[in-house]
């Protein structure tokens, strides 16, 4: 792009209304309104914000979690739906925003970032390519057809979710599309010291992403609340695991430095920063891993962006409805039933 705008970005740190689609959609719209009123042009939301992250997968076995999975399934986002209509209305604040949802497509669930533009259009989505560990009991896989970067008046916008930032091939694929502003959607930072899901580890991965791909990262995370604990914790051990707070939202510049206002780990709020896309250029001079600093002669990545469907339908079904009247009174010779 020939234009390198300066503008304000925002990263949300908040708790959803766990397993309540309508209430969390309403909260999402209020947060978009708030960020837009404070001048943000691009707004990031945490991983699995609508209708909340399935924390029970880390708290107990499948029998314990099934009742919550059923609630999640019934409160997931379908496209199209009234939920998407409401989110689209929030886009009329003349902002871009990216919100991570549990999407229901057919009979399966997927972890999906939805992108809305200033007209309220749903311009695309990114499904998490591979659910992490116990998440595989909830969400199916994405593919390369849903790994977009959008060319906009505010630069090239893209996003990944949680541990997707730890995978070098994901990072390289995003670099190949010349992303400039990145939404890094995370759940919370596990409070247990040394945990691989801890805030230090997640922030380190996001800072590496910012430096490696020369992008501004809008890191957005949830927080744990007493309401969430009351919703799904059935034992004292579970409550002790799910401690209140542990958000770590922040905005990271292409040099890995944190910019903007800071939020306490147990504080709901929005962190803002004023960014200048021209600051990306020095990094491109030094690195550009998908360009002059690459070594395609012996190291390269094949990035397949075609849609991968588990079942391919060939031809069209010939099924027709034969009415009661046709069955009872019609010419039997003309009545055909297709199996």
From Swiss-Prot:
Alphabetical keyword list: Hydrolase
Active site: 47, 128, 162
SUPFAM superfamilies: Carbon-nitrogen hydrolase
GO molecular-function terms, A-Z: nitrilase activity
Enzyme Commission identifier(s): 3.5.5.1
EC top class named in words: hydrolase
Gene3D superfamilies: Carbon-nitrogen hydrolase
CDD domains the record matches: nitrilases_CHs
Annotated PANTHER family: CN HYDROLASE DOMAIN-CONTAINING PROTEIN, NITRILASE
The protein, known as: Nitrilase
Annotated organism of origin: Bacillus sp. (strain OxB-1)
């Amino acid at each position: 792009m020939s234009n390198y705008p300066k503008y304000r970005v925002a990263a949300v740190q908040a708790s959803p209304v766990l397993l309540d689609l309508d209430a969390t959609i309403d909260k999402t719209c209020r947060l978009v309104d708030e960020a837009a009123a404070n001048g943000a042009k691009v707004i990031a939301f945490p991983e699995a914000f609508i209708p909340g992250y399935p924390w029970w997968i880390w708290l107990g076995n499948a029998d314990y979690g099934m009742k919550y999975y059923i609630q999640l399934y019934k409160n997931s986002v379908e496209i199209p739906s009234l939920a998407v209509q409401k989110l689209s209305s929030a886009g009329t604040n003349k902002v871009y925003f990216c919100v991570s949802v549990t999407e229901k497509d057919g009979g399966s669930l997927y972890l999906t970032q939805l992108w809305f533009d200033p007209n309220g259009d749903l311009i695309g989505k990114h499904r998490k390519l591979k659910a992490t560990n116990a998440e595989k009991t909830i969400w199916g896989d994405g593919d390369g057809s849903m790994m977009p970067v959008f060319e906009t008046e505010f630069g090239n916008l893209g996003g990944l979710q949680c541990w997707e930032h730890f995978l070098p091939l994901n990072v390289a694929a995003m670099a190949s599309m010349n992303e400039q502003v990145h939404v890094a959607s995370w759940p919370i930072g596990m409070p247990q010291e040394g945990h691989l899901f801890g805030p230090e580890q997640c922030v380190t991965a996001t800072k590496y992403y910012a430096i490696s791909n020369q992008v501004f990262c809008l890191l957005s995370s949830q927080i744990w609340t007493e309401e969430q604990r009351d919703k799904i914790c059935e034992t004292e051990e579970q409550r002790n695991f799910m401690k209140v707070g542990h958000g770590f939202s922040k905005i990271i510049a292409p040099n890995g430095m944190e910019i903007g206002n800071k939020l306490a780990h147990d504080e709901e709020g929005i962190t803002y920063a004023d960014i200048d896309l021209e600051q990306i250029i020095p990094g491109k001079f030094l690195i550009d891993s998908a360009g002059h600093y690459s070594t395609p002669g012996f190291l390269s990545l094949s990035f397949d962006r075609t849609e991968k469907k588990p079942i391919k339908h060939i031809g069209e079904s010939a099924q027709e409805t034969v009415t009661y009247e046709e069955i009872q009174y019609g010419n039997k010779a003309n009545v055909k039933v297709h199996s």
